[in-house]
Amino acid sequence: MSKVKNIAVVAHDNCKKELLDFVDCNHNILSRHNLVATGTTGGLVEKMIMERVEQKADEGYEFKPVNRMKSGPLGGDQQLGAMISEGKIDVLIFFWDPMQPQPHDVDVKALLRLAVLYNIPTASNRSTAEFLISSPFFEGEFQRKETDFSSYTQRKL
């Protein structure tokens, strides 16, 4: 995993405010990485980072647009899952709402399953996200252990 990470950020509606506060508090770090997000969350995160980068333009901050997928219920979670399986996501920050059933719960479960399957560092709440972003691995090199799936892919049916 290179120093510049591809970070997926997702938040259910009741968690968007908390995610935006996290982004605001950590925009100086996050602006150095490539962000990918589901639709609505991506728009809000992009706006937040753009405002902060504009405020600090004289300090050499550069704005990188957020790569926005579809909204979660419209397939965005599955798009992120596909990116994880293709090796295109390094970190997943997903503030999900444990108190609110979602119409796309199966998609959420699939996304989280793929993050575990491919050993992607994942934060599902603010505390874990703060631990992740403060790790020396977040901005440094990190060799993620990859699982060998050959016994599964080469099994005889």
Curated annotation (Swiss-Prot):
Record domain MGS-like: where: 1-157
Active-site residue list: 77
Top EC class of this enzyme: lyase
Name of the protein in its database record: Methylglyoxal synthase
Keyword field: Lyase
Assigned EC number: 4.2.3.3
Listed CDD domains: MGS
One Gene Ontology biological process: methylglyoxal biosynthetic process
Reaction catalysed by this enzyme: dihydroxyacetone phosphate = methylglyoxal + phosphate
A cellular-component GO term for this protein: cytosol
Binding site residues for substrate: 12, 16, 38-41, 71-72, 104
Pfam families recorded: MGS
Gene3D superfamilies from the UniProt entry: Methylglyoxal synthase-like domain
Keyword Lyase: yes
Top-level taxonomy: Bacteria, Pseudomonadati, Thermodesulfobacteriota, Desulfovibrionia, Desulfovibrionales
Gene that this polypeptide is encoded by: mgsA
Keyword presence, Lyase: yes
Matching PROSITE patterns: METHYLGLYOXAL_SYNTH, MGS
NCBIfam families reported for this sequence: MGSA, PRK05234.1
